[in-house]
Amino acid sequence: MLDIKLIRSNPEILKKALQKRKDNFDVNGLLSLDEKRRKTLVELEQLRNKQNENSKLIPKYKKEGKDVSSLMEEMKSLSEKIKALDAEVRKIDEELNAILLTIPNIPHESVPMGDSDEDNVEVRRWGEPRKFDFTPKPHWEIGENLDILDFSKAAKVTGARFTFYKGLGARLERALMNFMLDLHVDKHGYVEVFPPFLVHRNSMIGTGQLPKFEEDAFKVSDTDYFLIPTAEVPVTNMYREQILDVKDLPIKHVAYSACFRAEAGAAGRDTRGLIRQHQFNKVELVKFTTPETSYEELEKLTRDAEEVLQMLEIPYRVVKICVGDLGFTAAMKYDIEVWMPSYNRYVEISSCSNFEDFQARRAGIKFRRGLNEKPEFVHTLNGSGVAMGRATACILENYQQEDGSVVVPKVLREYLGGISVIK
């Protein structure tokens, strides 16, 4: 959520940001509603002042033996007007808040211009794509041939875009989770949490999934619960309506969770295999920082996610997301994309974002620099560290052998009891 004071004092900032995003939101309409609220508050304050004056005059006049009937009538009228204006202010506040919840974040000045993912800017690459002396198979075919992935049985049990991991497939997924958590906790200094997989509506509003993207969420019918689309939601909301001590910042959490996404607009895009599932596993990195350090912390967070792929020895690249591809909540975002041989292109495995105070303002997460200092909103950041299903997919594709077997990355072998080849 954006600060209405910022919009009021410098509406051109928002207008330019929305123009970059090609968003036709009516800024002038918002300002008119805000002005109406402010005028109503002034009128309300004047009526309350008059009410207070009269409340002092009535006992004085009574003591002096004066007639107070007209004052009593005026007090009754004032009370009715105040009640009506109070209700009007509450109604305007609700309307303003509902509107503010639909406005996207203002992109950072360094975000590249562009309309789609084709305009994202490559920042760096790591590793060289492997040259195969045979035609590489797609990961779903490799997994089915090795009997470690079963899409047809999952479709029978649940539906399309679900998977059974079996045998060494399940163990590989679990090995990835343990490896990533160990790396981020032991080397990168994150504190692990294991969050609930269900959250209520206010939590989804706090991190920006609602109200705008409700169609992409799985809601539990007849309740106010939603299945989480990412651990970002419960972990960020751990600090809802809380004032943190500046000495505790940055707070760094890592969390494993299952993630659930309807992906309503994703039909036909990478829907075969493990790339775009309705349910998938992910290790998430979440940070709470001061405003002045958040972009430095974004670089560190991105490097932490990259190290997962370096240790797995998977070729990847980092791209800075252009304004047309930037998510609703992010001020700046990097995508980390892994090389997928069967696709002959890079595929996203992690998004690392700085939301500045956009989420903190929605969720009421603040910090205080000193005992008598006014609380300020923290900056929140998060990134996949990384998506486990996509990591499994890129391991199967990049480490496949001509005989159909798959070599296990060296760093995972200790988590698989020394197994070096899946065959």
Swiss-Prot record:
Localization in the cell: Cytoplasm
Binding site for ATP: 261-263, 348-351
Top-level taxon of the source organism: Bacteria
Entry EC number(s): 6.1.1.11
GO function term, MF aspect, one: transferase activity
Reaction(s) catalysed (UniProt annotation): tRNA(Ser) + L-serine + ATP = L-seryl-tRNA(Ser) + AMP + diphosphate + H(+); tRNA(Sec) + L-serine + ATP = L-seryl-tRNA(Sec) + AMP + diphosphate + H(+)
Family in the record: Belongs to the class-II aminoacyl-tRNA synthetase family. Type-1 seryl-tRNA synthetase subfamily.
Subunit structure comment from the entry: Homodimer. The tRNA molecule binds across the dimer.
Record's protein name: Serine--tRNA ligase
